[in-house]
Amino acid sequence: MSFERPQDPSSALEQATQDVSNLKSESRFLLEEIRASDLEFYESKKRFLNKDTQIHKFIKQHGSLVDNPKEAEFQERIKEDLERCHQLQVDKCTVANSLLYMVTKHLKKVQANIEALEEDGLLAPLEDDAVELANELSRESSVLSSGTSLERRKRTVAAGTLSAGSSLRKRVKKERGRSTQRDGMLSEPPSDEASSHGANFADDLQDFNDELFSLNQQEEDDKQLYCFCQSVSYGEMVACDGPNCKYEWFHYGCVNLDEPPKGQWYCPECRQEMANLKLKKKKRV
């Protein structure tokens, strides 16, 4: 594609504004795809964690020697959800890479126009910070365009996005005060449609955050420590019937059990506490 040199800065600005006129809607569409994938990902993750929790609860209640009639079905569903989560992550990388490529393409064109105007003496050279930013964006676009395979792009997009994004945010704050007039020319008042979309997005985001909090809470519960050894739940475990037991569940090996106890069972500490109470009652009598 041939490069048409701009005649003056105003024509370059007008061309750049025209080129990015659809960028907002295109970016929103891609970001909504990523968000939809995130929601589906956390739903799948919640499902397989729930199935895994049910399997472990059955083992706690009946021991590992008793067959769980639903374990095979649960394991198959867990496998399906894990595979779906993996595919969703791959799809998100592809969409994010498309968005990065789309933005970088416009930035490269703006940079080329600026360099052409500087060469023709129609534009003063950029300040040091702006030059560094332009060079950094150029390096990112080179990395993106040099990759010929999707896997290679996926490996570079994460680091590139973080690097360019963090530098851009820092420097835009510095330049914002200098470009008030230019921003006023390009900005548009928000439309009713945009406001409605923002309100719907805020509601959906709140629902998503609530689901994420619930999922994190469930994960924290799975990390609870039990037994004298203060470890997470694993293998065969037995529950103490002591009403005030501070450990609640015990691993068989830690309390010298080989099979589920018959009737009520108390841990050594609770048995000692019960014995002390009986001794105190006898002394009072």
Curated annotation (Swiss-Prot):
Location of the region described as Disordered in the Swiss-Prot/TrEMBL record: 1-24, 155-201
Localization of this protein: Nucleus
Record InterPro entries: ING_fam, ING_N_histone-binding, Zinc_finger_PHD-type_CS, Znf_FYVE_PHD, Znf_PHD, Znf_PHD-finger, Znf_RING/FYVE/PHD
Polar residues bias: start-end ranges: 8-24
Domain of life: Eukaryota
UniProt keyword terms in alphabetical order: Cell cycle, Chromatin regulator, Coiled coil, DNA damage, DNA repair, Meiosis, Metal-binding, Nucleus, Zinc, Zinc-finger
Entry coiled-coil feature ranges: 10-36
Residues binding Zn(2+) 1, per UniProt: C227, C229, H251, C254
Signal sequence interval, chain numbering: none
Positions contributing to Zn(2+) 2 binding: C240, C245, C267, C270
GO molecular function: histone acetyltransferase activity; histone H3K4me3 reader activity; methylated histone binding; zinc ion binding
Keyword Cell cycle attributed: yes
Subunit organization: Interacts with H3K4me3 and to a lesser extent with H3K4me2. Component of the NuA4 histone acetyltransferase complex.
This protein's name: Chromatin modification-related protein YNG2
